[in-house]
A protein has these predicted regions:
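Structural microenvironment flanking redox-active thiols in thiol-disulfide oxidoreductases
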Residues: 87-111, 136-143
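Short pre-active-site segment immediately N-terminal to redox-active cysteine/selenocysteine motifs
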Residues: 62-65, 69-73, 116
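Hydrophobic beta-strand anchors of alpha/beta hydrolase catalytic cores
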Residues: 66-67, 97, 120
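Typically the conserved alpha-helix immediately C-terminal to a functionally engaged Cys/Sec
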Residues: 76-90
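Sec-exported extracytoplasmic/periplasmic mature domains
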Residues: 48-53, 89-92, 145, 149
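C-type cytochrome heme c attachment motif
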Residues: 72-79, 119
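Non-catalytic, surface beta->alpha helical segment in thiol-disulfide oxidoreductase systems
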Residues: 3-23, 27, 116, 121-151
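A short beta-strand-turn-helix
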Residues: 39-65
Length: 151
């Protein structure tokens, strides 16, 4: 991961044998409550926000969404995924959890100027997305509770 504030690059090992590389067509996307669901650009445009039709972010959903932009070569991303899976289960009836493979969805990453991974979007039903780069799972829970669920 990269810490732009401190101008440092951190390399952290992970077990490549644990990496699951998924290829998903637009018609194969199935989003389930309580899961961290892989999505494509097509799904994003249809159900989250169609940036081709509006420059202002207009969320299409009826439940808050957490979107993880990740890559298989990103150690911090790979360690974050199990934490997000736990959060997806914990908030299964309140928040939808999605993940976007940054290597496969370059256009989507480019549209949002994603320059560091992991980058996580927290999208409330009403309002602008909250974007976090490299924060801790505890910070994510705080954002979900205070911003998305307004607890």
């Amino acid at each position: 991961s990269i810490d732009y504030g401190k101008r440092k690059v951190y390399f952290q090992p992970f077990d490549l044998a644990e990496v699951k590389d998924e290829v998903i067509g637009a018609d194969e996307v199935k989003v389930e409550s309580g899961k961290l669901n892989p999505i494509t650009r097509e799904y994003f445009l249809e159900y989250v926000y169609d940036y081709r039709k509006s420059s202002e972010f207009v969320f299409k959903g009826d439940k808050p969404v957490v979107i993880d932009f990740w890559a298989t070569w990103c150690g911090p991303c790979m360690r974050l995924i199990p934490e997000l899976e736990k959060m997806a289960e914990k908030y299964k009836d309140q928040v939808i959890f999605l993940k976007v493979n940054a290597d496969k969805e370059k256009e989507l990453c480019g549209m949002f100027n994603i320059v560091a991974l992991p980058t996580v979007f927290f999208i409330p039903v009403n309002g602008k997305p909250i974007v976090e780069m490299g924060a801790t799972p505890e910070k994510y829970v705080e954002i979900i509770e205070k911003q998305l669920l307004k607890k």
